[in-house]
Amino acid sequence: YSMQPMQKQTLVPVELARQAVSEVLNDGLSDKYELELSEDNPGKAITITGDQSLLNRMLCNLIRNCIVHNPNGCRIQVSVGSCDRTCTFSVIDNGCGISEPQLNRLNNDKDISSTQKQTGEIEHGLGLKIVRQIVKIHQGTIQFSDTAPHGLSVEVVIPIEIY
């Protein structure tokens, strides 16, 4: 993404998330998955400056990771919120989660190859590398964490204004 110019425009984060959720649903999501969208601050209109197609790609990649890495199904919650001049996109699933070493590698910006281990465990790969690049060019941060009792939470925080 560093090779193509960023197409900056004013965007409504809730609409971005709605488009990504719709795109995944329209691709024919199996009944094993439950996909929900919520607003943390309903009625509070916020906008961000960013590239619509890149941010859509980021959200779709995060949602699809939940699907790919939970072949037996899971509940996926996509939420949008704002706080202190930032917008937060959260993608949370109640699937199998990831190991502590993988979580540490993800939170330390280590690239993880997309491979299936002998145990059958699939590691995250290129999709997250693309997500990281998109977050970076939007001057944001990304954080991975466990959810209780199991699952994964990914939180992307982007400034409401990019300078």
Q: Which residues are covered by each model-predicted region?
A:
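Short conserved segments within the C-terminal catalytic ATPase subdomain
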Residues: 27-39
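Acidic ATP/Mg2+-coordinating residue in the GHKL
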Residues: 93
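Conserved micro-motifs of the catalytic ATP-binding
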Residues: 1-6, 45-50
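Short conserved segment of the HATPase_c
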Residues: 98-114
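Short beta-strand/loop element within the Bergerat-fold HATPase_c
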Residues: 75-85
